């Protein structure tokens, strides 16, 4: 028996769990036509396949256990997220109720015009600070990007060759430069100038005022654009001028009719001031009677009025 056969038999014993190596060798010798090495090699491969299938089955069972555990944990995670969402919305509702209660109490104690004025001034000051921080952060981002790109290629450095010097001189003499187009100056400013001093409070104030005026106009213009787009959607191109004329005509008539003008349309339009009829004249007898009734006063009251007039007109 060779050493190879003994080693294979030992491996088979280790894999199959057999207790006696000699029994395996005898079984291998009694294999008939096949040699002992071939029989033992088959047994070895069978043992390896058996162990591999067992390992695979064990891994599948572990994955199934992990999957079932994750499936069991999922409802718990969903429950925690639901509870967190409920707490968040509950806190939001409580905050809104407290805010409305405080506003109602303040409006009962203070004049609502003064309260609205104070709230508007406070919001304006907060917006100024907000815009200042926003502009400062944007300036910092621009400065970071300029520094990150490095020194521009056209800028002269110490130890530059003659080609760089001549190119820079040619650009300086032949090409007009401005401060906004000068890359070297922009790079130097981004390194030296602090953004805190570049962004001034007046800039934030002007930005806030312009936003206060222009942002509502911008939103109104966008809304009008959407309205006209929906009105003219699906209308042929040659019908659009007619529709615009009709809209302008109808809106003009509505505006003018509120100003007490008469509108006649023999040739599409004619404007005249509205003729207002005067009220009917009251008969003279009725007017005299009403005047007598109105001006008839008690004697004591008339005397008092006379005395008051005398003392008022008398000069001492």
From Swiss-Prot:
InterPro entries: Chloride_chnl_CLIC-like. Keywords: Host membrane, Membrane, Transmembrane, Transmembrane helix. Pfam families: MCLC. The chain crosses the membrane at residues 87-107, 116-135, 236-256. GO terms for cellular component: host cell membrane; membrane. One of its GO terms (molecular function) is chloride channel activity. It is found in: Host membrane. It is a multi-pass membrane protein. PANTHER family: CHLORIDE CHANNEL CLIC-LIKE PROTEIN 1. This is Putative transmembrane protein ORF57. It comes from Ostreid herpesvirus 1 (isolate France). The lineage of its organism: Viruses, Duplodnaviria, Heunggongvirae, Peploviricota, Herviviricetes.
